[in-house]
């Protein structure tokens, strides 16, 4: 196979192939970030749906024009 500069840069990323962290690894951390992302999406949805009313935030199409 031909060696390229891009392959040399990306090789360290592939050197850990097949290795997994013992036990649950970073799964709890991933779950925490998924929960925070869910809360973020819910806040955005509530602002858009006008369920969460914020002073000075107008969610009409006219405000974008």
Swiss-Prot record:
PSII binds multiple chlorophylls, carotenoids and specific lipids. GO terms for cellular component: photosystem II; plasma membrane-derived thylakoid membrane. One of its GO terms (molecular function) is phosphate ion binding. Residues 45-65 are lumenal. The chain crosses the membrane at residues 29-44. Keywords: Membrane, Photosynthesis, Photosystem II, Thylakoid, Transmembrane, Transmembrane helix. It is found in: Cellular thylakoid membrane. PSII is composed of 1 copy each of membrane proteins PsbA, PsbB, PsbC, PsbD, PsbE, PsbF, PsbH, PsbI, PsbJ, PsbK, PsbL, PsbM, PsbT, PsbX, PsbY, PsbZ, Psb30/Ycf12, peripheral proteins PsbO, CyanoQ (PsbQ), PsbU, PsbV and a large number of cofactors. It forms dimeric complexes. PANTHER family: PHOTOSYSTEM II REACTION CENTER PROTEIN H. Belongs to the PsbH family. One of the components of the core complex of photosystem II (PSII), required for its stability and/or assembly. PSII is a light-driven water:plastoquinone oxidoreductase that uses light energy to abstract electrons from H(2)O, generating O(2) and a proton gradient subsequently used for ATP formation. It consists of a core antenna complex that captures photons, and an electron transfer chain that converts photonic excitation into a charge separation. This is Photosystem II reaction center protein H. The gene is psbH.
